[in-house]
């Protein structure tokens, strides 16, 4: 089943940072940290950074044989481009046959030959992120993926248990998947940046401004691999530009503890967190992490995060529907559905928190799929989504190496009538052709007005930084605004990306 909904407009290594870890409460296994973030008055010039999920992308990475619903493939190809990993010519021909039968145009698909190991389905976990280097080059950031995805208890110091073991009880390594990024880079004609540490994608959420979130199992995985906590943070700072690394407690009593099944970064200052039923055994754990950890964190702009909630429900016994395990790709959000009453509510919630985006939901009943591999049937049996393994786990963006990047420090509402309503933003043209400065503007209007006013952004002293003041101070009104920019390459971009359907806003008191 596939559901699409159009969202209505609505409101939508350390130098300055050190993180202290210690074991606090074994009942919920909190590993607390002090996160010191300076008060930032404007956005920063970013010389090296790891991309966020919501940034401009060329398309989506999948693997054949498929591990996602065929209707999802159709929609991904319709919306952008599908990059399909195949092991050989036989697999490519089979995939091409089915894609053609589903009406997917050949120009919307690319095939790339890569080796496939035990974990090939989970391109999110072993697959590469995108790092933009000081010279503006995008590289595929290839973390280590040697021991697959271990599980652990809820305590941050609990031991790791490895899923794949031989009859002799030795760990079966997943080096085949670990080695797949190099041929992927060759197929995409993109350079590969080797990250000498574990960087399991489903447990790494980044904001594009040097902040990342993971659960504490990631530190344990790296320690098992021989990378200390200090080395992990130092290497991230040096190679990915992540200076502010927020490690939160594990949230499952036993599991892989991947953060994308607990929360979702919506942008630089908003976090969507799952909310279980109040009578669920994990409810108090989820709430404790939110109250004691997330609410104490600061955004890159030195402000508390806006914490939003998405209600979930049981789909099988006590297993929770993983609605945060969704994919944000350009202007569309792809959501896993679990055939429960909470599905419709989850889609509506995604609409509310992401104005202007198209939200599409996908069920994954294997009986409804035209082609299902033997391995998929053995692994999932009846239904293809699980509480710790859904849509986000099996997809990954291929970001645009020549993107027009915009990030902004939005005006914090409400403001008084004497407040200088200055908007600061970072604009980087990775195409390197240069910006059309007269078309880098702020668009603003009184809320629900018909006409947009425009103000040209002024360059700051630091490269890539811009600002402008919205000259409106009438008490009792609300103002909507968005940023737009144009590159000499012909690319244009807005922030929010769905503007003018989605905008920023503030009220004047």
Residue ranges and their predicted role:
Residues 13, 31-33:
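Basic polycationic patches enriched in arginine
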Residues 1-10:
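N-terminal secretory signal peptides that target proteins for export/translocation
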Residues 5, 14-17, 406:
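A detector of low-complexity, intrinsically disordered, Ser/Thr/Gly/Pro/Ala-rich segments
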Residues 15-25:
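Bacterial N-terminal signal peptides
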Residues 34-405:
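The feature marks the mature, well-folded catalytic cores of soluble enzymes
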Residues 397-509:
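Glycan-association/targeting regions that enable binding to alpha-glucans and other polysaccharides
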